[in-house]
């Protein structure tokens, strides 16, 4: 997580900024990585109360821009009247191009009294409406509270002196940058001409069927007959466009129509009026078209628009009183609100109504808005921008917290005093290491703790050695959410989810889909779809897992298991390795949900939970045990794992179970044991030694068992127990020293148990090995894959590479690592391996070879982009470069391979010219010609600079052009007689003689004569 302040505090800046915007902005930790700058903008307004003492403040809490809201005063006739818009202190479009809102909060209160008033009267109602402003049906003081049923989105009768606080909470996390409607360079004859670039993302479109064979009939009146053809609700506070057409038909000669569109504000007044048609004559017997094509810029929308109206005025040329006028109309139009569907742009809205406040009082609106801003090119020259950091843990934690905001008491509207008191609680929510004292007092502690455990990086930061717990998301999170989690199809995830394997080439592991498993601990025998009843526990038990601690202080023995996937019975593929602990008793609550409900019996009839119910374990135990996966071992504790691991099979844990049954240690034994006990008390060898050894070493443990392990205990059980420190109990009861002989016909269960040893040479396995060798001889790629696997196995990093593959499913990180790895002959290679690295001469490729490699890289990159004609040979003929824009356009239009070194300029649009002003050219010429105080640049030099701007289509000089201009300036300065005279060179400083030290007042200086 980001922004660590000290060892005890770990803050999530984004959620802190959301809940407490006054603490400042923070980058949104999503995957939209744009260089931006963070900025806090304040909004402060003193609103004067009208004659009725009532008013309404409309806030747009999620609007990504300068608009904050609007203020309306209630008139004596019961209607609202628009007062003014509420904006941020700075006009953002003047300096910035793009914006994302991070957080916002606003406070409304009154603390001033007009003359003659001695008491502060009035109350406030506030509500957050999950809709647009035009959709409100009752905006009266009391009716406002019926806009929502959510108790956390409304408050009533708050004293105006106490005030209310409006908090902006995100409604979506899929947020892109929004164009702010900033001005763009343009030249026009009209001095008021303005050109802006508005947002075109996520528009809101209203489609209105204005008329469907509507019949109009009336008698002639002087001045015409006016009707409202339609009126519809729309919402707009940014630029909009209106398009469409109406078709009129008439049988009356000389009819004249006029059409006017009105955009009406929330108070019912016309904000914008546009005449669509004036004195438009209709021709009898034909279709008369009336097109609509209107653009309304943001600058003309001075208050929120909530409806649109179209009026038709009908008249008749030379008409007389009593003349009949009739026509019919059909058609529709569309109103497009630019950026209207961006989350938070028009919905939700927060309305704050005040009532019975003294006339002339001042209602203060103050708040802060935090933004991510991308500056315009001029400001970007002097403003440093930075990339946002993608932090999935912080983003996941924020989403989890806000998804439970109703249960956690997080509101959108607050009494100001209550919001101030909750700031300490918000700090606890944002601090991942806080003890949640205040949250516990409110009863929110258990919820927040559960969300912290689900949020992946949080567990790793609370318990640094518990980083592997980060893999518990996915299916594990779905299990923890219990029966409330559902898949996209609507069915429970527990019945439809599948765990993912290491990469796309390995088949997905079936967990709960058919209540079976294909994850085995050996490479010899795979059960054929054994039925496992009750893999998933009840939802109540699963929800209880929220309260489990990660650390368990209990005696245990440890053993590693290699988990593999299988395509069929003879083609296994290694996937992962995991450490398991043997604990005494029935402890299914410590197991992951995927392992619960499954057990196997021993020869004595006792159960071992966590094993697949296939056969019996060839052990005689005196009690019941549970096998649980773990992620680490501390001094006297083990760290449990919630990875969705199915029940295990095989005999890797026999030695650990036997040791646990005999000695029953009080603390975990810090040695991993592996081996299978047979009927003669001997410990048989196992496979995947290096993989299990690497698993043990990763946890800081040694591995014990037969073979070349850290602790070579031999193949005899008696020798094994003598080399371990233990506290023997019931020493005379060691059934493994004198295990009775079991005949071969003891039954299928014993045969399966004996066959479950992890590795045995069989004819089938030998045949499979020969088949792989034959395939490697034929397929070089398969040979390379086997070589890589052998290299991983020899170095003991198979498990590490498998875990890395799980975290890098698309191999992006691996490709970047290989691309940036030091090559033979590089400086880092010579520094590490000397002049010959890896046993070969450390020299780089030849120029020809390097050029061929470059051509190949360019070709592969083009191939990933779907440009298949750019083969390495074509790239070499094209001057060792990729296709130009003209070549790409030629290929896209003709689907023919373009000729190398042919630019096809006819297929490329000419670059648009942009004029540069004389002032801009003069400033550039002055800056290049010399520093301030020197001679002004001559006209000839200004003309040279103007030529550069003309060549560059209005842009400044590049580096080469700048060098030429500097040389030209130097030549002109030497030829200019009016140039400033050169400054004289400073004379070297001659050190002065050091004055004699000051003698005391009564001390006489000693001369040479005195010394003689």
Swiss-Prot record:
Sorted alphabetically, the keyword list is: Capsid protein, Host cytoplasm, Hydrolase, Metal-binding, Protease, Serine protease, Virion
Q: What are the catalytic residues?
A: 652, 692
User: Where do the segments described as Interaction with VP1 protein lie?
Assistant: 1003-1012
State which residue ranges cross the membrane. Answer: none
Which segments carry the region annotation Disordered? Answer: 971-1012
A GO molecular-function descriptor: structural molecule activity
Positions contributing to a divalent metal cation binding? 30
Q: Which GO terms describe its cellular component?
A: host cell cytoplasm; viral capsid
Which GO BP terms, alphabetically? Answer: proteolysis
Q: How is it modified after translation?
A: Specific enzymatic cleavages yield mature proteins. The capsid assembly seems to be regulated by polyprotein processing. The protease VP4 cleaves itself off the polyprotein, thus releasing pre-VP2 and VP3 within the infected cell. During capsid assembly, the C-terminus of pre-VP2 is further processed by VP4, giving rise to VP2, the external capsid protein and three small peptides that all stay closely associated with the capsid.
InterPro entries in the record: Birna_VP2, Birna_VP3, Birna_VP3_dom1, Birna_VP3_dom2, Birna_VP4_Prtase_dom, Viral_coat
Site annotation (Cleavage) points to 441-442, 487-488, 494-495, 501-502, 512-513, 755-756
Catalytic class of the enzyme:
hydrolase
Q: Give residue spans, biased composition: Basic residues.
A: 975-986
Peptidase S50 domain mapped to chain residues: 513-755
Q: Does the keyword Iron-sulfur apply?
A: no
Q: State the superkingdom.
A: Viruses
EC number per UniProt = 3.4.21.-
Its biological purpose is as follows: Capsid protein VP2 self assembles to form an icosahedral capsid with a T=13 symmetry, about 70 nm in diameter, and consisting of 260 VP2 trimers. The capsid encapsulates the genomic dsRNA. VP2 is also involved in attachment and entry into the host cell by interacting with host ITGA4/ITGB1. The precursor of VP2 plays an important role in capsid assembly. First, pre-VP2 and VP2 oligomers assemble to form a procapsid. Then, the pre-VP2 intermediates may be processed into VP2 proteins by proteolytic cleavage mediated by VP4 to obtain the mature virion. The final capsid is composed of pentamers and hexamers but VP2 has a natural tendency to assemble into all-pentameric structures. Therefore pre-VP2 may be required to allow formation of the hexameric structures.
Return the protein name: Structural polyprotein
Q: Which organism is it from?
A: Avian infectious bursal disease virus (isolate Chicken/UK/UK661/1989)
Q: Please spell out the taxonomic lineage of the organism that makes this protein.
A: Viruses, Riboviria, Orthornavirae, Birnaviridae, Avibirnavirus
